[in-house]
């Protein structure tokens, strides 16, 4: 009998997703392949998706509306959408209020990992309900599976 492998549930912060999507040949290209191949399942909420959509419009990326749609189509279908309740769970104090939706998503979605490069979020590692790790650390974990 073959053991069923559980898909790793992961919250990816916006900058991690942007790096994987916009820089297709960059250092986070393996992360994009991981969600496309079903090695991990990104979790999203309406708030985190809205932030990603807003970030894709930043002038520095020089992406047309069509390119933005293509990048979203390369990510969102692989994600599980988590509904954050009207009374969201308490999160640890966080300096940046824009980080709170990612912490809430990790809690409500019962994520295995929150993947980020944000030093404010990384400073909560070891004190939060799920592991908070860098993209590099996450890729190492995926490679071990």
Model-inferred region functions:
Residues 12-14, 45, 117-118, 134-135:
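A secondary-structure boundary/capping signal
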Residues 17-18, 50-51, 121-123:
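Short, active-site-adjacent cap segments at secondary-structure transitions
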């Amino acid at each position: 009998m073959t053991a069923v492998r559980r898909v790793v549930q992961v919250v990816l912060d916006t900058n991690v997703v942007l790096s994987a999507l916009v820089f297709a040949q960059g250092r986070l290209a393996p992360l994009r392949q991981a969600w496309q191949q079903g090695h991990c399942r990104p979790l999203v909420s309406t708030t985190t998706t809205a932030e990603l959509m807003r970030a894709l419009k930043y002038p520095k990326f020089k992406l047309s509306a069509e390119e933005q749609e293509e990048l979203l189509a390369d990510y969102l279908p692989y994600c599980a959408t988590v509904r954050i309740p009207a009374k969201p769970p308490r999160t640890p104090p966080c300096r940046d209020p824009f980080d709170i939706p990612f912490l809430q998503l990790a809690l409500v979605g019962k994520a295995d990992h929150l993947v980020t490069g944000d030093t404010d979020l990384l400073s909560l590692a070891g004190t939060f309900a799920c592991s908070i790790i860098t993209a590099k650390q996450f890729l190492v974990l995926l490679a071990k599976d």
